[in-house]
Protein backbone atom coordinates (compact mmCIF):
# COMPACT_ATOMS: atom_id res chain seq x y z
CA UNK A 1 0.00 0.00 0.00
CA UNK A 2 1.45 3.38 -0.96
CA UNK A 3 1.85 6.26 1.48
CA UNK A 4 -0.95 8.84 1.59
CA UNK A 5 -0.28 12.14 3.34
CA UNK A 6 -2.46 13.13 6.30
CA UNK A 7 -3.99 15.97 4.28
CA UNK A 8 -4.84 13.66 1.38
CA UNK A 9 -6.15 10.97 3.74
CA UNK A 10 -8.38 13.54 5.45
CA UNK A 11 -9.88 14.56 2.08
CA UNK A 12 -10.26 10.93 1.05
CA UNK A 13 -12.15 10.08 4.25
CA UNK A 14 -14.39 13.15 4.10
CA UNK A 15 -15.31 12.37 0.49
CA UNK A 16 -15.95 8.73 1.37
CA UNK A 17 -18.19 9.76 4.27
CA UNK A 18 -20.20 12.02 1.99
CA UNK A 19 -20.54 9.17 -0.50
CA UNK A 20 -21.79 6.81 2.24
CA UNK A 21 -24.22 9.48 3.48
CA UNK A 22 -25.62 9.77 -0.05
CA UNK A 23 -26.00 6.02 -0.45
CA UNK A 24 -27.17 5.01 3.02
CA UNK A 25 -28.10 8.08 5.04
CA UNK A 26 -26.71 8.84 8.48
CA UNK A 27 -27.61 5.36 9.78
CA UNK A 28 -25.32 3.76 7.21
CA UNK A 29 -22.23 5.71 8.24
CA UNK A 30 -20.02 3.30 10.13
CA UNK A 31 -16.27 3.03 10.46
CA UNK A 32 -16.33 -0.03 8.21
CA UNK A 33 -18.54 1.52 5.52
CA UNK A 34 -16.42 4.66 5.31
CA UNK A 35 -13.14 2.72 5.28
CA UNK A 36 -14.48 0.44 2.55
CA UNK A 37 -15.66 3.40 0.46
CA UNK A 38 -12.28 5.12 0.89
CA UNK A 39 -10.37 1.88 0.34
CA UNK A 40 -8.45 2.82 3.48
CA UNK A 41 -7.51 0.95 6.65
CA UNK A 42 -10.05 1.15 9.49
CA UNK A 43 -7.44 2.64 11.80
CA UNK A 44 -6.94 5.59 9.45
CA UNK A 45 -10.27 7.08 10.57
CA UNK A 46 -9.23 7.17 14.22
CA UNK A 47 -5.69 8.23 13.36
CA UNK A 48 -6.85 11.11 11.13
CA UNK A 49 -10.00 12.25 12.97
CA UNK A 50 -9.96 10.71 16.42
CA UNK A 51 -13.45 9.26 16.08
CA UNK A 52 -16.17 8.50 13.58
CA UNK A 53 -18.25 11.34 15.06
CA UNK A 54 -15.45 13.81 14.31
CA UNK A 55 -15.27 12.53 10.74
CA UNK A 56 -19.04 12.81 10.25
CA UNK A 57 -18.92 16.37 11.61
CA UNK A 58 -16.14 17.25 9.16
CA UNK A 59 -18.11 15.77 6.25
CA UNK A 60 -21.29 17.60 7.19
CA UNK A 61 -19.35 20.83 7.71
CA UNK A 62 -18.01 20.44 4.17
CA UNK A 63 -21.52 19.98 2.80
CA UNK A 64 -22.80 22.99 4.76
CA UNK A 65 -19.96 25.16 3.43
CA UNK A 66 -20.78 24.08 -0.12
CA UNK A 67 -24.50 24.72 0.39
CA UNK A 68 -23.81 28.11 1.95
CA UNK A 69 -21.68 29.14 -1.01
CA UNK A 70 -24.20 27.82 -3.52
CA UNK A 71 -27.20 29.51 -1.88
CA UNK A 72 -25.46 32.86 -1.31
CA UNK A 73 -23.59 33.06 -4.64
CA UNK A 74 -25.38 35.19 -7.15
CA UNK A 75 -28.02 36.59 -4.81
CA UNK A 76 -28.47 40.25 -5.69
CA UNK A 77 -28.49 41.67 -2.18
CA UNK A 78 -29.08 45.16 -3.59
CA UNK A 79 -32.49 43.97 -4.79
CA UNK A 80 -33.64 43.85 -1.17
CA UNK A 81 -34.95 41.43 1.38
CA UNK A 82 -37.96 40.18 -0.57
CA UNK A 83 -36.20 39.07 -3.77
CA UNK A 84 -33.36 37.52 -1.78
CA UNK A 85 -35.68 35.51 0.46
CA UNK A 86 -37.53 34.25 -2.61
CA UNK A 87 -34.15 33.40 -4.18
CA UNK A 88 -33.08 31.46 -1.08
CA UNK A 89 -36.27 29.41 -1.17
CA UNK A 90 -35.84 28.67 -4.89
CA UNK A 91 -32.26 27.52 -4.36
CA UNK A 92 -33.20 25.30 -1.41
CA UNK A 93 -35.95 23.72 -3.52
CA UNK A 94 -33.32 22.87 -6.12
CA UNK A 95 -31.07 21.35 -3.48
CA UNK A 96 -33.75 18.90 -2.35
CA UNK A 97 -33.35 17.00 -5.62
CA UNK A 98 -29.55 17.20 -5.66
CA UNK A 99 -27.89 13.89 -4.77
CA UNK A 100 -24.96 15.51 -2.99
CA UNK A 101 -26.87 18.03 -0.89
CA UNK A 102 -30.27 16.41 -0.53
CA UNK A 103 -28.83 14.14 2.16
CA UNK A 104 -27.85 17.18 4.18
CA UNK A 105 -31.32 18.67 4.00
CA UNK A 106 -33.40 15.49 4.27
CA UNK A 107 -31.40 13.17 6.48
CA UNK A 108 -29.35 15.51 8.63
CA UNK A 109 -31.96 17.93 9.85
CA UNK A 110 -31.47 18.45 13.59
CA UNK A 111 -33.21 15.46 15.15
CA UNK A 112 -31.42 14.88 18.41
CA UNK A 113 -28.28 13.48 16.78
CA UNK A 114 -25.45 15.12 18.74
CA UNK A 115 -23.26 15.24 15.66
CA UNK A 116 -25.87 17.22 13.76
CA UNK A 117 -26.83 19.52 16.62
CA UNK A 118 -23.24 20.79 16.79
CA UNK A 119 -23.62 22.03 13.22
CA UNK A 120 -26.98 23.74 13.66
CA UNK A 121 -25.40 27.15 14.31
CA UNK A 122 -23.49 27.00 11.02
CA UNK A 123 -26.68 26.11 9.21
CA UNK A 124 -28.61 29.04 10.67
CA UNK A 125 -25.69 31.43 10.27
CA UNK A 126 -26.18 31.36 6.49
CA UNK A 127 -29.52 33.16 6.68
CA UNK A 128 -28.20 35.68 9.20
CA UNK A 129 -25.18 36.46 7.01
CA UNK A 130 -27.41 36.99 3.98
CA UNK A 131 -29.74 39.29 5.94
CA UNK A 132 -26.71 41.27 7.16
CA UNK A 133 -25.40 41.58 3.58
CA UNK A 134 -28.77 42.82 2.36
CA UNK A 135 -28.92 45.43 5.15
CA UNK A 136 -25.53 46.80 4.11
CA UNK A 137 -26.45 46.77 0.41
CA UNK A 138 -29.85 48.46 0.72
CA UNK A 139 -29.04 50.72 3.65
CA UNK A 140 -32.10 49.92 5.74
CA UNK A 141 -33.45 47.32 8.11
CA UNK A 142 -36.23 44.89 7.22
CA UNK A 143 -39.63 45.34 8.84
CA UNK A 144 -38.86 42.27 10.97
CA UNK A 145 -35.60 42.38 12.98
CA UNK A 146 -32.83 40.66 10.99
CA UNK A 147 -32.12 37.85 13.51
CA UNK A 148 -35.82 37.03 13.67
CA UNK A 149 -36.19 37.15 9.88
CA UNK A 150 -33.22 34.79 9.53
CA UNK A 151 -34.71 32.36 12.08
CA UNK A 152 -38.13 32.51 10.41
CA UNK A 153 -36.57 31.81 7.00
CA UNK A 154 -34.72 28.78 8.33
CA UNK A 155 -37.77 27.59 10.28
CA UNK A 156 -39.81 27.63 7.06
CA UNK A 157 -37.08 25.69 5.27
CA UNK A 158 -36.78 23.18 8.13
CA UNK A 159 -40.53 22.57 8.15
CA UNK A 160 -40.78 22.02 4.41
CA UNK A 161 -37.71 19.78 4.42
CA UNK A 162 -39.17 17.61 7.20
CA UNK A 163 -42.41 17.26 5.25
CA UNK A 164 -40.44 16.42 2.11
CA UNK A 165 -38.49 13.77 4.01
CA UNK A 166 -41.81 12.23 5.07
CA UNK A 167 -43.73 12.38 1.77
CA UNK A 168 -40.97 12.76 -0.86
CA UNK A 169 -43.23 14.99 -2.98
CA UNK A 170 -40.98 17.55 -4.65
CA UNK A 171 -43.90 19.44 -6.22
CA UNK A 172 -45.43 20.11 -2.82
CA UNK A 173 -42.04 21.02 -1.34
CA UNK A 174 -41.28 23.47 -4.16
CA UNK A 175 -44.74 25.02 -3.90
CA UNK A 176 -44.52 25.38 -0.12
CA UNK A 177 -41.04 26.91 -0.28
CA UNK A 178 -42.26 29.36 -2.93
CA UNK A 179 -45.24 30.38 -0.79
CA UNK A 180 -43.13 30.79 2.33
CA UNK A 181 -40.75 32.89 0.26
CA UNK A 182 -43.58 35.19 -0.83
CA UNK A 183 -44.99 35.52 2.69
CA UNK A 184 -41.61 36.23 4.29
CA UNK A 185 -40.63 38.58 1.46
CA UNK A 186 -43.82 40.57 1.97
CA UNK A 187 -43.36 40.66 5.74
CA UNK A 188 -39.72 41.75 5.44
CA UNK A 189 -40.46 44.57 3.00
CA UNK A 190 -43.65 45.83 4.65
CA UNK A 191 -43.26 49.24 6.21
CA UNK A 192 -45.61 50.06 9.05
Placement of each model-derived feature along the sequence:
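Amphipathic alpha-helical packing segments from all-alpha helical-bundle domains
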Residues: 68, 73, 98-101, 114-138, ...
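Amphipathic C-terminal alpha-helical segment
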Residues: 98, 111, 133, 154-172, ...
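Hydrophobic alpha-helical connector segments
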Residues: 58, 69-101, 149-153
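Short helix-capping/turn signature of helix-turn-helix
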Residues: 49, 94, 107-114
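Helix-turn-helix
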Residues: 6-12, 16, 20-58
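Short Lys/Arg-rich basic patches
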Residues: 2-3
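Solvent-exposed, amphipathic alpha-helical segments
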Residues: 12, 16-24, 70-73, 108, ...
Amino acid sequence: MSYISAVDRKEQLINATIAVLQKSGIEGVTTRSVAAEAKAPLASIHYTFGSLDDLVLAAVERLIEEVNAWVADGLDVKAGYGPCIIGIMERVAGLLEDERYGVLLRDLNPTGDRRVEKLEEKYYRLAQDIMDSIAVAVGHEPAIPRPQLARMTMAAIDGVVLQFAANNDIKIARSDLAQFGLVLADAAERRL
